[in-house]
Amino acid sequence: MCRPSGYAVYLWHCDAQGRYSLYSSGVTGENYLRGVSATDSSGNVTFTTIFPGCYSGRWPHMHFEVYRSLSAATSVSNKIATSQLGFAKAVCDTVYAQSAYSGSATNLAQISYASDGIFQGNAGQVATTSGSVSAGYTASITVGVSV
């Protein structure tokens, strides 16, 4: 949640195979699973996307940056905060049982939230998640940003 309203949040994450558009081999010319949205009058921001895959060495996560406005979000030098949100293992296990996420279950088995070099077990970065594979999931997290 960002107050006042109108702050921009840039969110990006990897695909079901653990690849990042623009950066990973085979998808450097593609731009997907990235988006910017402005906070509403309650300071909330919403994105519709897929559950991120799990790649070797990292716990499943989404990256985000916060900017003072949508126009400020055009340059990384304007960001006022950068962080990530992670997901509970039970949700990851359920999603990664689906065929589209075939490699993610193997990668997840090789890491823990506590051993991830970024999260290091920080429970404050785990999103609250509800839903199901068939209906879709909703993840939410409250983030404090000093401005």
Regions found by a protein language model. Give the residues of each.
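Beta-strand-dominated extracellular/periplasmic modules and repeats
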Residues: M1-Q110, A114, S146-V147
